[in-house]
Amino acid sequence: LIFAGMSSLFSRVGFMVDAFSQEIKNPEEIFNAFDIRYVQHFLVVWSHLILGFVILVFGPFQFIPWIRNRWIKFHRWNGRVWLLCGAVTAFTGAFIGVVWPFTGHQGFGLLQATINAIIGPYTLFCLYKAYSCIRARNIGAHREWMIRSFALMLGVATQRVLMLVLIPLTGLGAEVMFASCMVLGMLINISVGELWIKLTRTPGTGNRHWKELDRKIAL
């Protein structure tokens, strides 16, 4: 999913660079309904893309146990940066999807706007809970809210993978499948995230990793 997200991100970056490298008098005549949003609202888009890149690159480091154990300062500072970038990216992503759904505010465009209006604030809530839990030294809950927030952020990558598979299979266009795959992608990631949390939850504050507990029981 990281690579799928990166592929989608670099595709949009390439489009933006190409679009602004040429003089275009009337963008409406050149770009389709999906692409023109990137041109007309480039400041919001660039902030979303750049900080999204930071999330995809540095996010996985937060979930590697030996980095947490050996380089705790890096883990803490990386976490702060990641939380900040995640908050801005969640807001800009929701803002774009709610205010400028590429099929308008009717039909599947309304579905796109609705799912963004739900997922955006929920992602911000997960990030807030992750921060507040670690401030309270509740490591177990912090870990769980971090998993939830990252699963939500990777939902767009899952959406893109689903679109690559389902559009050729169904013969339906992107106008229909974009919102549908977004809903399905988010549901898949939320479900997998919650399942992983349930399978790896530790008692108490979660200061010890579940594998360590299993080792002690085995011994």
Residue ranges and their predicted role:
Residues 1-219:
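Alpha-helical membrane insertion/targeting regions
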